[in-house]
């Protein structure tokens, strides 16, 4: 089995790319054509998020790991990922496919050991969220729990697992205190304007 087949198992389909491409931020001005396509780099980001591995382990078929990480980091800082999600929500709402029976839950992600004190000679991700101390600001979404450094994602999703809102907290944060905040973060703009929809028909939680 080739590495291409393994890497491409869950890449974007042509139909998904056709839906996604018009929503992406505009690229740089005309110049030397990029070595890797946006589709390659985005598939690389998606692969890395699914696999949960260091950026350096992203398969070469997606481009250099530095290019994959650079796109992720640039769009994260610019708020582009959140804007893309909102645009997809708008299209889904206009098509009437959002199921407003909403489920609220959370999942914990273990952080890499370098997350709270990365070395500065990595050639790429050299800027840690904080110093090597035990303290992490609340807005970094990183804290110590029984499993070590972890982050917790609190989500509200519809029946088809379509994300409607997400909050990131430190891993030791409880679910109940975030319940209202997760629901209050639901806001799906309407395609033709008007007030965004924020109220589910029903909420499921445990």
Model feature map: region roles:
Residues 1-206:
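Short alpha-helical elements
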